[in-house]
C-alpha cells in the first residue's frame, strides 16, 4: 500500500499527548528524559506504556537494569524544569542535581513542581520500528498540585516530535 505521508502527517500530529519527564535510577546512576508518548494501558493492575526512541538506548538499558521509573506529569508552568531535559546530561552528577526532588517507594527522583507522578516498575517491552514501547506496572503515585493544568501536546507533523 502506498502511503501519502504528506496527507497523513497533519492528521497523525493531532493525536493528543502530554509532556512528561521520565525519571530512571539504577544503583547510583540517575537519568531523565522528556517524553510525550505516555498512555494509561490498564486498570488492574494499573499499567502505563511509554515510547522510547531507539536513540535513547542508554535510558532503556538503565530502565531494564534497574526496573524502576517515575512518570512526572508536567504542567503548562513547567517550561523551565522541562528545558533542563532538552540538553545533554551533565558529565558528572545527576541531571536532577539542580532540581527540587524527593523520592517515594521506588527511590527514583520525583519532581516536586510536577502536576503529579506515577511510580512504576518495568514489566515488558515491544519493538515498534524506530521506538521501543515499554509497559510498566504502576506501584503508586499522587498529585503534587491541583492548581497546575497538565500540558497538552499536539504536533503539526506526525512524523516529527
Name what the model sees in each region.
Residues 1-161:
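Basic, polyanion-binding surface patches
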Amino acid at each position: 500500500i502506498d502511503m501519502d505521508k504528506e496527507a497523513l502527517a497533519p492528521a497523525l500530529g493531532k493525536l493528543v499527548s502530554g509532556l512528561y519527564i521520565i525519571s530512571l535510577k539504577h544503583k547510583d546512576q540517575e537519568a531523565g528524559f522528556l517524553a510525550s508518548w505516555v498512555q494509561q494501558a490498564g486498570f488492574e493492575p494499573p499499567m502505563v506504556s511509554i515510547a522510547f526512541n531507539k536513540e535513547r538506548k542508554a535510558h532503556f538499558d538503565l530502565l531494564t537494569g534497574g526496573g524502576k521509573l517515575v512518570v512526572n506529569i508536567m504542567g503548562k508552568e513547567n517550561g523551565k524544569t522541562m528545558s533542563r531535559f532538552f540538553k545533554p546530561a551533565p558529565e558528572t552528577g545527576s541531571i536532577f542535581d539542580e532540581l527540587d526532588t524527593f523520592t517515594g517507594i521506588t527511590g527514583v527522583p520525583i519532581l516536586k513542581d510536577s502536576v503529579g507522578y506515577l511510580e512504576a516498575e518495568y514489566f515488558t517491552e515491544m519493538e515498534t520500528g524506530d521506538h521501543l514501547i515499554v509497559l510498566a506496572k504502576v506501584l503508586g503515585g499522587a498529585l503534587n498540585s491541583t492548581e497546575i493544568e497538565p500540558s497538552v501536546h499536539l504536533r503539526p507533523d506526525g512524523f516529527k516530535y
